[in-house]
């Protein structure tokens, strides 16, 4: 497969913008009257600030985020991976505490494995950046704002770390699955 992608790489594009075909949108329903998260930006090294700036530019270019005018937002957390690169995360713990829980069922791994007994053929797909294929409900986009030294931004697609993201993604998989 890698050979095919390498040979015909010009036909494989990196998706940009908000997926227009996706009927499943991620809502962010908040507890009425709850205060929105509004922490102070963390002090960081020059290297970390450069990485945050690079990642924000990449996400803006892809159309996954946009500038926000909301006066509050969650904070960025950088986590260094084993290979020395950085994982860009948003600390949504405060937002998640005031988000109404979605109880869409997520199957147990052992139940899924039981369904495979006796089967002869298996396939595997890589849902690269799968969450980024799910748009945020347009009326809820402002709720997932985050702060950076460069300004305030909000996700147009579902980021990792939000309460109910696994349930939204499972619903999408159920809709496209068998």
Task: Identify the role of each PLM range.
Residues 1-178:
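Retroelement reverse transcriptase polymerase core
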């Amino acid at each position: 497969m890698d050979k095919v992608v390498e040979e015909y790489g010009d036909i494989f594009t990196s998706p940009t913008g908000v997926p227009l075909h996706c009927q499943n949108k991620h809502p962010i329903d908040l507890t009425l009257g709850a205060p929105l998260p509004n922490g102070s930006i963390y002090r960081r090294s020059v290297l970390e600030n450069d990485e945050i700036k690079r990642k924000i530019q990449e996400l803006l270019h892809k159309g996954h985020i946009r500038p926000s005018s909301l006066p509050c937002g969650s904070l960025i957390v950088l986590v260094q991976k084993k290979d020395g690169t950085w994982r860009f995360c948003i600390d949504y713990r405060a937002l998640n505490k005031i988000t109404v829980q979605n109880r869409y069922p997520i199957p147990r791994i052992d139940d899924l494995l039981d369904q495979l007994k006796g089967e002869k053929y298996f396939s595997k797909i890589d849902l690269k950046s799968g969450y980024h294929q799910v748009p945020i409900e347009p009326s809820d986009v402002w709720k997932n704002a985050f702060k950076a030294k460069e300004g305030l931004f909000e996700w147009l697609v579902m980021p990792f770390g939000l309460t109910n993201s696994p349930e939204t993604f499972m619903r999408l998989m159920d809709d496209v699955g068998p």
